[in-house]
Amino acid sequence: MRVGTSSDGKRQVIHLLDSICKSHRLQIRSSYGAEMLAAAHGLDDAYPTIVTLHELRTGVLKPEELKSIRERGGLCILVTLTTDAESVFKSLTSRDLKVPTEKTLLGHVSWIRELMQLGLIRALQWCDTRDMTADGHTKGCIDRKLLLQVMTGELSMEHPVKTFCPHKK
């Protein structure tokens, strides 16, 4: 989603740019594992859109510039990763990196933490599952009110939200 301004310039609106729904082709043994992979795959899937938004503001990037942004940071847009899995939020925001019980997830955890340190992810946010609009795209039991709000340009969180903004290297 992208934050913008209404045509009259009086209110902030949200634009849904892309929505992806797919299954993992990996065997997952825990909900933590499924949520961590969803976060990592979501970032991976969103990266081309993020780069496109950056290019719309700064002009077309040369391959060396794109590589430099990935290695050192420097996006002109602010990216917030939102999850409703508190265990994922805690493992990504902890001071010390701890190896997950499912050791195969360590690469995913390390990759997301690296993106946060470089500033490619400005903030990590945890929200209550009841406020998670992405769940409405895939689960039939989720209230459609949030989806309808997003389609009209509004995104509101009715429950407390935790936000972590890491310091850039």
Please provide the spans of the model-predicted regions.
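RNase H-like nuclease module associated with reverse transcription
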Residues: R25-K169
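A short, polar/acidic, helix/strand-boundary loop motif
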Residues: G4-L37
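Gly/Ser/Thr-rich active-site loops/lids in small-molecule metabolic enzymes
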Residues: M1-G4, T104-L105
